[in-house]
Amino acid sequence: MSHANPVQFINGQWQAGLGHDVSSSNPARNEVIWQGKTASKDQVNDAVLSARQAFESWANISLEARVAVVTKFAELLAENKDALATTIALETGKPKWETTGEAGAMVAKVAISLKAYNERTGTVENPMPGAKAFIRHKPHGVVAIFGPYNFPGHLPNGHIVPALIAGNTIVFKPSELTPRVAQEMLKLWEQAGLPNGVINLVQGEVETGKALASHKLIDGLFFTGSSNTGHILHEQFAGQPGKILALEMGGNNPLVVKDVSDIDAVVHDIVQSAFVTTGQRCTCARRLFIEANEQGDAILARLIEVTKNLTIGYYDDEAQPFMGSMISEKAALSLVDAQAKLLALGAKSVLDLKHLEVGTGFVSPGIIDVSDIIADIPDEEYFGPLVKLYRYNDFDKAIDEANNTGFGLSAGLLSDSEASYNHFFTRIRAGIVNWNKPITGASSAAPFGGIGASGNHRASAFYAADYCAYPIASVEAEKVSLPETLTPGMKF
């Protein structure tokens, strides 16, 4: 069946895709909620050209005029927050309590981005003899933005808002798993009064993404997603130093527990680190280090008890669940497969991760002890509620193993000892390091990013302003004049 729904937004016009049929389903109930056609290569080209045509006028209007449009978008977000939260929940399977928070974070992002623009990329003036020195910033031009499915509103919004404030124009390619959320977002930008071509939406799968990423007329690409895709983009951009590439990828994140008095508080933070958003946050704890002693045994026993009792359910249940569905049945089965492979290597199941309902993304959280097979464990991000358990005797060796990864996004220590945290902080390699807080907790008022396979030193959140504009250094005087002292060897 062919779907001529106008799901592409190019040069201010909604139009049907010219590619093949695609659809999006609610992963909790296996119901189709969106249908359309992918953007063709020609449509991607049209989107880039329209962004290129719109760039000069958008970049050259006053900052106040750009801010007015972005502020109007924030107002529309606030007015439509509940509807957007429902759409996010419907398409991702996340509980409504969580998607309401995501929609709220999208509203707050505008004020934070304005503050970041002024603090990090505003204009700085310094006096110097006979002149003034200025630091100003200019937008890059046309930027491609690739969004993920786990936070399909908040994370691309974290690229889009600062990029527009800086004066860039955009071609946005959302995850093919969350096209409906992207479409609702773009309708709000349209209502906010963005000029035609300033933001464009191209819906599609891998082919659409390749056509956009490889387009010669884009000046940069901002990506949030898997490490595998990020590495492909990095290779594709090699030899193009004139293009800005900002990558925010995943992590194989360690959470270490040492010498704690409040076991319930520790278990709470472990659960929030490993299983919130059904384990589908890039900052989720993938590796849990617990001491091999009596206290460690007590912590593990309580963790198993609490995890078994976590409520799993539909996003719209009146009594809201802790965990909803994963993004798809395919994603759920990939976690079941990952668990099976670890068991085949010799790991021991502490709590089985189970696929709960055929045709859906529902799984139960799992804990698997890998203490005896450390040398054989693949350095992979299992993007879901499956945490690998390491029992340890030596704190420094635990930190060594925590660092034994090519990733470097988030890490944390749960400990009553500040000295232990200071030691941990000094040695651990990650872009986000927390003490006695879940490692999934991050602030939009701080940078967000990792090292190694987790990113390319282009931190987002508050530091997104840095990759949305480039600095211009100027020395300026009102008229040309001879210096008081001539350079040796010159005569006038």
Curated annotation (Swiss-Prot):
Q: Which Pfam families match?
A: Aldedh
Which SUPFAM superfamilies would you find in this protein's record?
ALDH-like
Its transmembrane ranges are none
Q: What's in the keyword line of the UniProt record?
A: Arginine metabolism, NAD, Oxidoreductase
Domain of life the protein comes from: Bacteria
Which InterPro entries does the record associate with it?
Ald_DH/histidinol_DH, Ald_DH_C, Ald_DH_CS_CYS, Ald_DH_CS_GLU, Ald_DH_N, Aldehyde_DH_dom, SuccinylGlu_semiald_DH_AstD
Show the active-site residues: E248, C282
Cross-referenced Gene3D superfamilies: Aldehyde Dehydrogenase, Chain A, domain 1 (3.40.605.10), Aldehyde Dehydrogenase, Chain A, domain 2 (3.40.309.10)
What is the purpose of this protein? Catalyzes the NAD-dependent reduction of succinylglutamate semialdehyde into succinylglutamate.
Similarity comment: family membership: Belongs to the aldehyde dehydrogenase family. AstD subfamily.
Which named protein is this?
N-succinylglutamate 5-semialdehyde dehydrogenase
Question: Per the UniProt entry, what species is this protein from, by scientific name?
Answer: Colwellia psychrerythraea (strain 34H / ATCC BAA-681)
Name the gene that codes for it: astD
